[in-house]
Structures are given as structure tokens and as C-alpha cells.
Amino acid sequence: MHELGTRQRPLSSSSSSSSSSNMTDVSAAAGGATAPAETAATSSSASKPLTNGANKTSTAMAAPTTTPTTAATAAGAAEAGAIASVAGISNQVKLEHHHRQSNNNRPVAPYPPVPAAKPKPTPTPTAESKFKSTSREVDVALRPTPARSSTISPGVSIHTQTIQQESSSAKPGMSSSSSSAQQDVDEVARLFEEKPEAFEKWLTERAPPEALSRLQEFIESRKPLKRPSVTSDLFQQWMSASPTVQQKSPRSLSNSSASSTLPECRRHLMDLDEGELFMELIRDVANELDIDVLCHKILVNVGLLTHADRGSLFLAKGTPHNKYLVAKLFDVTQKTALKDAVTRASAEEIIIPFGIGIAGMVAQTKQMINIKEAYKDARFNCEIDLKTGYKTNAILCMPICNYEGDIIGVAQIINKTNGCMEFDEHDVEIFRRYLTFCGIGIQNAQLFEMSVQEYRRNQILLNLARSIFEEQNNLECLVTKIMTEARELLNCERCSVFLVDLDCCEASHLEKIIEKPNQPEQRPTRAIMPGDSFDEKKMRNRFTVLFELGGEYQAASVSRPSKTELSTSTLAQIAQFVATTGQTVNICDVHEWVRDHNQIRAESEIDSTQAILCMPIVNAQKIVIGVAQLINKANGVPFTESDASIFEAFAIFCGLGIHNTQMYENACKLMAKQKVALECLSYHATASQDQTEKLTQDAIAEAESYNLYSFTFTDFELVDDDTCRAVLRMFLQCNLVSQFQIPYDVLCRWVLSVRKNYRPVKYHNWRHALNVAQTMFAMLKTGKMERFMTDLEILGLLVACLCHDLDHRGTNNAFQTKTESPLAILYTTSTMEHHHFDQCVMILNSEGNNIFQPRTTRTFLLLARRFLRFDLLPFRAFTRALRPLVRPLLELDVLELPDPSRIFLLTVYLRLVTRTIFLPPPEDEEEEDEVEDSVVLVVASVVVVVAVAASVVLKAELDVEALSPEDYRSVMKTVESAILSTDLAMYFKKRNAFLELVENGEFDWQGEEKKDLLCGMMMTACDVSAIAKPWEVQHKVAKLVADEFFDQGDLEKLQLNTQPVAMMDRERKDELPKMQVGFIDVICLPLYRVLCDTFPWITPLYEGTLENRRNWQDLAEKVEMGLTWIDHDTIDKPVEEFAGCADEEIKDIEFTVTTLNCNQQAQHGAGAGGDDSHTPEHQRSGSRLSMKKTGALGKAVRSKLSKTLYNSMDGSKPKTSLKLLESHVSEDMDDKSPTSPSQPPHAGGSVGRMSASSSTSSAGTVVDKSKKRSKLCSLL
């Protein structure tokens, strides 16, 4: 029955007809002891739904046959009978329940509603049988039924509701009462509450599918905050894969089943008055979201309201400048089924432009048109009548507007069916009022349809995004999938993708990929006008691959079109136009567009082409890498702006997919090239065998001969080979070779390889690594810090010191970041340090360089070499039999043997091969045949088993002292942490934590975090240990560091066009002493001071740094006064020579430049200076008088002094130069005298000592120091 006929409303308590109807229902349920009129009313109510119209009809029919008195009597009797029957039923329920409880094992017969014959005994039902027999009642109980109001007592109302539920849900053959059914349900429910596992078992094993579905519906209906929305069940149904026509709303599913029953379902609506019918029809379309179902309901309901014969509904489509009407449903009558109407409209789509025809005029003017005689109106088109044979008399056409007043459709009804020849004003008013509500419903349905389309689009785009990662190694599959999705979503006939040949497929494109892409620019989508043109010279043969996808059942094709095919194909020329201009083209008429563009030749392939949508495909750099093309929509209409928007998303994903695939191919190529480069690098980075053998055979001197235990070690006197021998001595002296069973040749090869991988830069070279490693060795041995370290940690620290600057390029991390070098891209933090560690790992992984390899493998290699020397295989037949047994073990690894076993068997196999090749052939072939095959096989098998067992046993014995995997990971972790700690940024991060531990008196450094902090501080102390070397070593090393920094500054000026910092600016080289003092105060002295406080055995590092600070401070002050220039190759002569003096005058003078107040030094003597020399420089008072501060050495004097010194280099006039110097200094010294001559002299560290005559010094000539100083002062 139709939904409108089954809709029930709450009955009014004041309605007499409603009370009468309820009473008759109760009487019928009680047994029928009522008057015939009541029985008739009961039967009428049972056969017809309880609607207002039905109640009115039944009352009207009963009125002529009864008088008022009779009716009142009948009503009273009915009410009394109802009360009595209810009381009887209540007692019957109590008795039956008591009987079931008192005798639960005997058969129980249901009590009839009225006295009847003796009931037939039945067996006692179990809980499971009750649930099976009452599954329909359970279903009724699970369904939420709204309560109905009534004027009767609550018990009667509930019973009435139960009877209505039973009468509406039970089949005609059911004989069980509602009370007994309810009791069965309650009993089964109690059983399931007591034993929920039984209920779960029944649901999983024996529940029928329909019961599970109803239960699921009930659970879903009980969810809180359930309201109709885009996330409702209807929306979920719509989003399924079924076609839209099959997605009916729940209220319309029963309506479209059979067209013959449709008039019967709606016949009861004729009994409603006009107002109720109008509201009922509005409710019918209010919540409908299926646009097809909604339009069908609108036409059917309008025909019912206006008594029209048939109707049509048109929806507005197109752009604001090109609107037209599309017939959604056409000629729908009261008997037309939904499926037939939709099928007929889809088969022949009717398009009416605005302003054409009756519907077009209504859409354009927004005014209603009521035609009384259609054939007399010039706007009427009678062609449809001629085709169908139907005669149109009256037409009423009215616009459908949204809430803003815009036209969204037009509704048209034809011919009246109630005998009238035309539509009157009443019909027009009803039509207008109803379409007002229909406009709201149509717009909601369209919005819902758009949301569904958007959801489908998003799902497709998500699938495409997923496909980009799934098909990144197969471009053909990826493009085919994208084209298939685009063709199905946009409903077009063909789809093509043209790919452009770019250099992005080459590995050299990697630098372009690394660059950050700019923001993508928006490209407007517009239709190509006839006046648009382009330069024919810009069209080039750029397409190399063409993907084509035809109809639904056609497979995709991939081809490489030739130049001739591209030049003769119209579609290809249009694609070239898009690739050249970078614009999206939407061609409505291809033939007209080709005629307007003379450069493009029209071919026969466009005869069947009507519309084309063509769009460029760009990559991240906004470079056109292809063109996507859609051809002909399935319904023959042009591509809309919405189609272009959707297609743009496909083009973007296509570009992403193509770009990603190309980058994946490039990455594969680069990885292959990287493997080749690493192989070549590993070969060239490894030391040669000749060098390794030579170093292996060299004698290694003792550590004392290399001065390895001293903190004053210098490498200036060592040749390159001696540096390698010194490294080997450190490993031997720490007992690392014997402790970890490191093969001596492997260690030699590794040392030579490490030296080979250092670049010949000025400071961060192999000798710097040697000095760092020697300082670590001295700290461990002389500084007694090895007692805080394990042997494994000592090994890791020495390896880290030697490898901490591998492949250093002479530039720091900041320079790598500024220039955006590949290293800076590869490592974001501690760039060079990570690279040094990677180089260290690369060398260790090179063949023959892994000093951390397990001992068992090396042992079995030695066993293999020894095995080859013995002659264990006397028979040729034996070798032939044993060889096929050993070879599968080596190739297939059937026994899953460990590495030593495989090596041992490989040795056996090699021995068999060599014996087979080099053994002379037997003199007597028959003697060889005498050996039985079975004996040979048995002996060969025994040899294999023994070899495997022996290798396993030997491995178990030798693994005791091997470097286990845990030890290997531990030593590699130590090496990595130590190398990264040489980054001063890491030092500053760890320094505060280390200082806190030292200040708290920490003495246990065995924890993992504390040990890591200690190792990091030790690595930094070793890395900057050149600052603690003797002054004659330190100032040379400082000059090397400065030169390397100056080279980086030159690169910054040249490449980056920026001004470098002071320490890297060659023009500010005179500030080097001052910068050295700052470096010592900020980094070196605090580090060495805290280390000395904790480990007093390394005090020489602190003292040497303090001494060098005094020297740098003095030199910095002399630079400020102009007495020296930092422009030599090395700073071994910080003060200029007095080349103008005669040799005989300075023959025995040892120039000692300490301070400029030489007279005070002469007065106080060496004792005062010696006492003060032990006081740290930065702790002394600033009482020392400087000629710079007093102005004793003016600018003019310094200029003349400079000229005198440099002009006297040739020694032509030494005496004159000396006198000139003396006169200038004396004049200036007389003008400015010291303010406090009694102050103690400043004991800054001596900058250097220069002997004027080495022969005199060697002869042992004794010179008075005070006399020397006096002579020097007299010269000044």
C-alpha cells in the first residue's frame, strides 16, 4: 500500500469517531459480544487504516442505519464489553502466568479469549523453541513503535496498541495471543540476560539473516544525536556503487515496484479535503533527496492536485551567459512508473534554450503561461503530438525558483481530466503554491547530488593519490588508471594524454629538483574564441609518448607517434597548441575552431568530434610535461566549467604521478651510479698492496723515540712513513692488536687508507689527525685516563681521532650551509662531522680494511690457506665424487651453515678443483675404474660431515675472544659520538652538563651518559691541543689555520659576494693574535681548567695554553703599536729584525722581546721577572706601561722606523740606519717619561728568542743578560 495511505496520525481525544473506532477495535479483540453495527464497524476498521479520512468515512456510513438512541446504546454496550473483555484478559494473563510457574514441566494449553472447548495439550516449549516460534514477535518488540494517545484507560490503550501491532504484523494464520507472545519474549529475554553467552552463540550460529539485519537497524536507530544529514543512511546508500536510479529513498522503494498498483495506492487521497491533501503531498516531497524520485513525485502530485493528465519537468543548466533547459522527466502520468520515466528521459534528452518555446519563454521571463487552446498558440510545437498521436488542448507552464528568485526549473502540465477544458485560476494558485515548496526540495536535492558527486570525486582523487605511490615504477599503468577514472567521472567518449620529451628524465635534473619551487600560478580556464591564434613557429615536435583510451570496453594503447603523425593529426596539433601556450582550451565546436585557426589542418578524424577539453600537465617547476585531452561527452553536450574544474584535478594528479615516476626512475639511475661510484671510490681510496706490504715489514720504533708520551709532541720532523709507524706504535702500545686479534696487515692497510683519504689542505690534513690521536694517546697513558676507559672505548677513541676530519675540504659547516652544497643537503646538522663519520664507515667497509671484523672469519681464512698446502686427495675419482657434494652446500646453503663452515667447505672445493686440474692423468685408466663408486661416495660424505663439524667446533672455541655483534655496535657508537663531538656546537651543548658534574664532585664516570660527556670533552681537548704546544710549534700551526680560514674567506667573497668574518678576512690578518687570545679565553682555557681539576695528570695542557696566551697577548699589543706585521709565511719572526745594525754591534746580542719598558726590567733584574712569570697573564694587574698608551712611539716614528728597517735590508748603510733609529727613539722617549717607574715589569711570555750568531752561541760565549737588555734598550 502506498505510503500516504499507511501514514497514521495521533487520534484526537475529543473526536467521537475516534473513540468509537477504538472501542470497536477492543470489542473485536474481546470476543465480538457486540451489536451487528459494532461488528460492522470493527470489520471496517480492521480492513482500513486508521486515518482521519477513514474515520470520517466509517462514521458517515454508520449514520443512516442507526438512530441516535441506538447509536448511544451501542456505544455504551461497546464500552462495557470492552471493559469486561479487558478485565477478562487481565485475569487470563495472571492465571496463565501462575499456571506456567506452578507446573513448568507439564504441557500448558493457551487460554482462549472467550469460553471455548477444552484446549488441546501441547508439549512444554523450551527457551530456544519459544524464541524460534516467536521470532516475529521478537521483531515486533525490537521495532520502536510510537505510542498512540487515547481517551480509554491506560490498560485498554496498551492492549489496543498490542492488537494493532499484532494485526499489522502477524500473518492471517497466526492464532497465538499477544499476551502469551509477550510472555514468551520476556522469558527468552530473561534467559539471555542470565546466559549472555547462549545469546551470542545463537546469534553467531543460528540467527537468520533477516533477524540480524533487523537487529542492526534497531541498534542504529537507538544511537544518540541521530538526525538526517549528509552522513545519514540515505547518503551512505547514495554513495554506493549502484546507479542513481536504483538508489531510491526508503519511502519510495515500495512505490516503484509495480506501476499498476500506483493509482490504487493513491486512490484514498481523493477522500481527503484540499488542505489536508496539499499538506500530505508537501510532506511527501519535503525530505526527498533523490532528484529523479523527487521530480517524479512532483509531477504525480501536481497531477493529483490539479487533475492534470500528464506533466513534464525541466531543470535549468548551463553557464550564466548560456542557459538552457533539460527535460528531467517528460510526459509523466499518474500511471507512469519511475523507472520508465527515467529511462525514457535518459534515452532522448530534450534541450530547450531560454526564450525558445513555451517552457523557454517561461524560464526567460519568469512568468506563468496558461494556454487554453494549444494549437492556436504560435509558441506551441505540435511535432510531439504528431509522433505520439496525443492531442494537447490546455497547457499550464510555471517557473520554479529558489529562495533567491533564480530560475532552477520549469514545470508544465497538460489537459484536465475532470471534464474541464482548461486550467482555471484555482488550479494556477494551487500549482504556484505547491511549486514554491518544490523549488526548495529541488534545490536541496541538487545540493545533495553535488555533494555526492564531490564525494565521488574526492574518493577518485584519493584512489589516484594512492595509485601514484603504488604505480610509481610503471608509468603506463599509472596514466591508464588516471585516464579511466577521468573518462568515467566526466562521462566522455575518449581520453588521451600526450607526454613531452624533457630533460627532467636525466639524472642531471637533480639540481633543479633540489631547488625550492615557486608558488604555482593560477591559470584561468576559458573557452577558446575564434579570434585566438598562436605562432606556428612555436609548434614543435615535442610529444614522444601518446596514451589513448577509447570506449568502455576498449583497452588503453601506448604509442610513440612520429613527426609526420603529429603534424597531420588535428588532435595532436591542438595538444601542441595547449603545450605551447600553457592554456586550457574548451572547444564547443571543433570544426568551427579549426576553420578559425588556419595553422591547424583539419583531418577526417575530427568528423565525429564535437567537443574537446584540453589541459596542460605541469610539474613542480610549472614546466609543461604533457597534455591531457577529453573528447566528446556521452550526451553530446559541450564540456562545462564544472567539467573543466574536475578535469584540472585529474591533470594535477597526472602531473604529480608522471613527475613522481620520472623522479623514481632518476633515483634508481642515481642509486646505480652511486653504487658504481662507491665501488670506484672504495678501490681508489684503499691503499695499494705494495704500500701495505712495505709498512707491514717495516720496523716500528718505540714510543719514546717518537715522543708519543709527551704533550709537547710535534710532527714537523717526521716524514709521512714515520707518521704511519707512529700510529701503529700507539695501537701496539695500547695492546689493541692482540686484545682484539686485529690482523697486522689489515691494520696497516687501514692506516694507509685513512691517510690517503685526507685531502692536502693546509691544516685539516693527515698530520692534524696524527696530532689529535697522539694527544689522546698521551691523555690515556701519561694523563692516566685509560683507567676510566675500557679497551673497546680506547679502540673507538683512537679510531675516531684518526678519522675525525676525513675528506675535509678546508671549509667549515657554515660555508657548506651558505653555499647549499650537497653535503649540507645530506646532513642538516654537524655537516662535515657526519661526512667524516660516513667516510670512516666507508673505509672500514672496504675490502681488507675492516679492523673490527670478527676473528672467526679471519681464523678460517688462515685455515683455508694452510689446507691448500696439504695433499689429502690422492685419487682422481675421489675428487670427482666429492666435488658435486660440496658445491651445492656452497651455492644453495642447504644446511644453513655459518660463515666459517662455508669458508672451510669453499677451501675444500678449491682444493678439489686445483687437484683435478693439476694432477697428471692416471697412467692406467683401468686402475681408476677399480675404485668402487659406493666407497668413494661414503668417504666423500664422511669428509664433508667432518669438515662441517670441525668448523662449528672451531667457531665455538674461537668466538670467546672475537668482536661480538654487541661489541661491534658499541665501538661504532663510540666512534660516531666521538667524531660528532668535534663540532664546537656540540661542545657548547655538552659543556654545561659536564661542568655541573665536575662541580658536584663527580668521580664515577662509568655511566653511559657520563662516559659520553667525558669522551666528548676529551675529543674537543685533543682537537684544539695545538694551542698547548710549545710556542715555536704553536705559532706555526696558528699560521696554517689562519691561511686555511683566509682561503675560505676568499671563496666567500668570490662565490657568495659577502664579507667574511674577521678571522677569515685576509685583509684583517693583523688581528690574528687578538683573535687567538679570544679563542683561548672562550674555549681552551675553560676546558683545560675543568679537566685539570678532575684529572690533574693532564695539567701540562693547561699550562701550555696559559703560556701561549701570554705570548699571543704580547704579540697582539705589539701589532697595535706597529712593531710587527703578520705577513710572513709563518710567524716564526714576529718582531722585525734590526737589519740596519752592524754585524759587529749585534754579534753577541740575543734579542729578547718581552716588553717595551726595558729600563725597568734592567733595574728590577731577572728575579722580579721570574717571580712574576708564574702568575697567569689574565690575572695580573694592568700596571705595565705601554708606549702605545703613553704615545712614546708616535705615528711618524713608526713610519720612519718601518722605512728604515725595510730600506736597510741590503745592509749597505747599517750604521746610519742604526743611528737614525736610535735618534728617533731617543727623541720620542725624552718627550714622554713613564709616570710610575717603580712599577714591576710586565712578565708577558716571551715571543721568541733569536740568536744573532749561532756560531757564537755554540762556542759557549757567556753574555750578561742585563747587558744585552741594556744594549737593546739603547737601540730602542
UniProtKB/Swiss-Prot annotation:
Compositional bias (Low complexity): 12-47, 57-76, 167-180, 249-260, 1248-1263
Residues the entry annotates as binding a divalent metal cation 1: H768, H804, D805, D1023
GO molecular function: 3',5'-cyclic-GMP phosphodiesterase activity; metal ion binding
Family annotation (InterPro entries): GAF, GAF-like_dom_sf, HD/PDEase_dom, PDEase, PDEase_catalytic_dom, PDEase_catalytic_dom_sf, PDEase_CS
Binding site for a divalent metal cation 2: D805
S-farnesyl cysteine lipid attachment residues: C1273
Protein name: cGMP-specific 3',5'-cyclic phosphodiesterase
Source organism (scientific name): Drosophila persimilis (Fruit fly)
Organism lineage: Eukaryota, Metazoa, Ecdysozoa, Arthropoda, Hexapoda
